[in-house]
Design a protein with these regions (language model features):
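Ser/Thr/Pro/Gly-rich low-complexity linker/stalk segments immediately outside membranes or between
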Residues: 34-56
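Short extracytoplasmic
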Residues: 50-79
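Mid-length scaffold segments of soluble, non-membrane domains
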Residues: 86-137
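Surface-exposed, gly/pro-biased binding rims or lids
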Residues: 133-177
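Short, exposed beta-strand-loop hairpins at the edges of beta-sheets
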Residues: 177-185
């Protein structure tokens, strides 16, 4: 082969590998940015007293002028009567370090998955043993549901822009339970536990 052709091939190969390297770097930077700055950021909340530590890990989507809860035909983001992972991105998981009672049912210490089926009049809440499933975006295995119960949603007076889970203390004149509160848009549910 002539020397000129060999030099040309080496230069072409170097350029080719540089371009491939830049493309791979751009893809890597895009994924790193997406993980570090998700549209629905990851959050953790915790409740602790002398009996239990209750920690929840979930992603917090924004309303962004969308219809959140409603009929599928109206374009609701979370349609009534359908599975919702109760957050965004991956499943909502929680852990408890000692046994608690939820809706009259005893739940042993451990890690769990929380999901819901919102409704206009009632929400179905499910506790599932399928926790920490990597990027669990599909419906969980219902055979692993440990309990389910219904909660009546409450209408809020002010819009909650970002999906929020927190804990509220029991009312002074009410039952001796704490509430796991879920709020988004104009809807709130409280899951009492003790």
């Amino acid at each position: 082969m002539p020397t000129i052709l060999i030099k040309f091939e080496k230069k072409t190969m170097k350029t080719f590998f540089k371009i491939i390297g830049l493309i791979l770097l751009a893809i890597l930077l895009f994924f790193a940015y997406s993980i570090m700055n998700p549209a629905s950021p990851l959050d953790r909340v915790a409740f602790e007293n002398d009996k239990v530590t209750f920690e929840v890990e979930y992603s917090r989507p924004f309303k962004k002028d969308r219809l959140i809860f409603g009929n599928k035909s109206d374009g609701a983001l979370v349609p009534f009567g359908e599975y919702w992972r109760t957050g965004a991105n991956a499943a909502t998981n929680f852990s408890i370090n000692s046994d608690i009672t939820i809706s009259g049912i005893r739940l042993m210490s451990g890690k769990y998955r929380l999901y819901t089926v919102p409704g206009e009049e009632q929400w179905e809440v499910f506790i599932n043993s399928e926790a920490d499933t990597f990027f669990a975006i599909t419906e969980p295995d219902s055979a692993k549901d440990l309990m389910s119960f219904t909660i009546t949603p409450q209408q809020l007076n002010e819009t909650v822009e970002q999906f929020t889970i927190d804990f509220i203390p029991s009312p002074p004149d009410g039952p001796s339970s704490t509430g796991l509160r879920l709020r988004w848009d104009l809807t709130e549910i409280v899951i009492p536990f003790n």
